Amino acid sequence: MMDLFKTDIMPDLQSSMMASIGSNWRFALFVAATLLTSYIVIVRPLKNVLFHPLRKYPGPKLFAGSSIPYGFWYMTGKWHTKIRQLHATYGPVVRIGPDELSYACPEAWEDIYGRYVPAKRKENPKPVWYCSPDAHDMVGASLGDHGRMRRVMTPGFTYSAMCKQEPLIKVHVDLFLEKLRGVCDDGNATVNMLEWFTYCTFDLIGDLSFGEPFGCLENSMLHPWLQLVFANIYVTHIILLCKRIPFFYLFLPIKTTLQLYRDFNRHVILLRQVVERRLSLTTPRNDFLDIMTSKKTSTLYLTNEEIFKNAILLTGGGAETTSSSLTGMAFILTTRPDVKKRIVEELHATFPNEEAINMRSVAQLTYTGAFIEEAMRYYPPGPNTMWRTTPAGGNTILGDYIPENTIIGIPHRVLYRSEAYWKHADEIHPERWLPDGQRPAEFDHDRREGFQPFSYGPRACIAMNLAYAEMRYILARFLWNFDIQETEQSKHWMDNQKAYLVWDKPGLFVRLKPVAKEEAQ
C-alpha cells in the first residue's frame, strides 16, 4: 500500500499543488495588473482633477487628468492650433496637463522668463527633458555656467563685431543672388525659396560658427548633416516627447530612431574635425570661434566641449529660424503686392545703388523693418512654447504661487494672434510697427511689448541683433534684384503646416524675375 501511495497518489497531489500555485500566481498578477491599470486610468486622473494644487486653473478635465491627450496632439503637429482653441475657450491661463500651465498674456514674460532677483524671484529653469544642464551649451546651462558662457560670447554679437563679420556675410549673400539668377530662367522657372534661403543662412552661419561653410550654395543642395536634420524633424521631436512622457515610446519607430542616432554620431565626429581644423588656424577670421577662444581667464572661458556644442547651437538655432522667417516673408510678399511695392519703393528712395546696401545701412529702412516684425508676428519661427519649470520651493507667476516642478510657458503663435492684444490679429499690417507719429491710430493699443520671438530675459537668443540685421540685409538685396510672384503650387503655403519646436515646412515655389539694371537705380 505504501508503494502504491508513492507511485500513484503523490504525483497527482504534486501536480494538483503546482496547478494551484500557478493559478494563484496568475490570479495575483491579474489582480496587480488590474489595480495598476485602474490607478493609472482612473484613480490618478481623478486625483489630478480633484485634488491637485493646480485644480483651480481652467482647462479641459481630460488634459488636467493626464499628459496623454497633450502628447497625442503634439504628435500630430497640430498642437499650435489646439492650444489656440483652448485659450480662446478658457482664457489667458489654461491648465493643459496635470502639472502644466499655458500663459497667453504679455505680462507673463517677466515672471516666466525673467532673470533671477535675490529675495524676490528665482529663475525658472528649463526642464531637463528639454535641455540638459550637462549638454555643455548655453541653452541648458546652469545659472552660473550660462552667465560665464554668455559673457565670453556676447562680444561676438555687438555692432562692432557685426561690422567686422560683414565681409564674410556678403560673400554668401552675393553667391545666393548669383545662384538665383542662374535658376530663375527669367521668371519662367519655379524656384523653391525655402531651399535657397536655407542654403544661404546655413552657409553663412556655418562659416561664422565652424570656420567654413557647409557648401550648400556652391553645390545647390543641403549638406548631408542638414539633410539628416530636416528629414527627421518628426522623429527628433517625438524623441523629445518620449523623454517627457515615456508612454509615447510605444509610438517611436525603433529602427528609424537607432539609424538616426548612428547617423548623428557619425556627423558629430565630422563636425568635431571641422572645429579642430578651424581652431588650428592662426589667422584671425572675425568669426564666432575667434570670440569663443579669445581672452581666457580663470573665470571667463569656454571648454573645448562647450566651444563645439555652442557652435552647433548657433548654427542650428540661428540658421533655421532665419531661413524660416525669410521664407515666411517671401510667401507673404507673393500674397500682398501692395506691401512688396512699398518695400521696394523704400529701398529705391533710400539707396542710390545696390553697393549702398549693407548690414548697417539697412537699419534705416523703417517700413521694411516693420514688415519683418509683422511677418514674424504672423508666422513666428518658433510657434509653440519654450518650456520652463518652477524651481524647488515654487515661484510666483502673475501674483499666484505656482508649486515646484510645474511646467510653464508662453505659446508664441497664440499670444501673437490674440485679438485681446492685437488689432486685426489674423491680418498682416506692417504699419502697426511704425514709430509713433507714423503708425495708424487704430494700432496704438497693440501690446507690442508682448512680442518676443527670440524669447525674453537673460536666456533670450544671444544672436537676436545679428538675426535682425541679416534678415534686413538679405531681404533688401533680394528685392533689389528680383520681383517675386506666387505660383498655384504654393498659393496656400501657410495653410495646414505642422509645428513642433519649429515649423515642418513644405517647399515654397515661386517665380523670380530679375529686375532690369536700369530699373534698380
Curated annotation (Swiss-Prot):
Cofactor names: heme
Q: Which GO terms describe its cellular component?
A: membrane
Q: Where mainly found?
A: membrane
Q: Which gene encodes it?
A: bet2
InterPro entries from the entry? Cyt_P450, Cyt_P450_CS, Cyt_P450_E_grp-I, Cyt_P450_sf, Cytochrome_P450_monoxygenase
Pfam families this protein is in?
p450 (PF00067)
Please identify the protein, giving its name as recorded: Cytochrome P450 monooxygenase bet2
Q: Which family is this sequence assigned to?
A: Belongs to the cytochrome P450 family.
First-level EC class: oxidoreductase
- How is this protein positioned relative to the membrane? Single-pass membrane protein
Q: What does this protein do?
A: Cytochrome P450 monooxygenase; part of the gene cluster that mediates the biosynthesis of betaenones, phytotoxic polyketides involved in leaf spot disease in sugar beets. The first step of the pathway is the synthesis of dehydroprobetaenone I by the polyketide synthase bet1 and the enoyl reductase bet3 via condensation of one acetyl-CoA starter unit with 7 malonyl-CoA units and 5 methylations. The C-terminal reductase (R) domain of bet1 catalyzes the reductive release of the polyketide chain.
* Glycan attachment points: 188
Its recorded reaction(s) are: dehydroprobetaenone I + NADPH + O2 + H(+) = epoxybetaenone + NADP(+) + H2O; dehydroprobetaenone I + 3 NADPH + 3 O2 + 3 H(+) = betaenone C + 3 NADP(+) + 3 H2O
- Tell me which residues bind heme: 461
Tell me where the transmembrane regions lie. Answer: 23-43
State its location(s).
Answer: Membrane
Q: What is its EC number?
A: 1.-.-.-
Q: State the species of origin.
A: Neocamarosporium betae (Beet black rot fungus)
| Keywords assigned by UniProt, alphabetized | Glycoprotein, Heme, Iron, Membrane, Metal-binding, Monooxygenase, Oxidoreductase, Transmembrane, Transmembrane helix
Against PANTHER family, the record matches this protein to: CYTOCHROME P450 (PTHR24305), P450, PUTATIVE (EUROFUNG)-RELATED (PTHR24305:SF230)
S-S bonds: none
One MF term in the entry's GO annotations: heme binding
Q: In which pathway does it act?
A: Mycotoxin biosynthesis
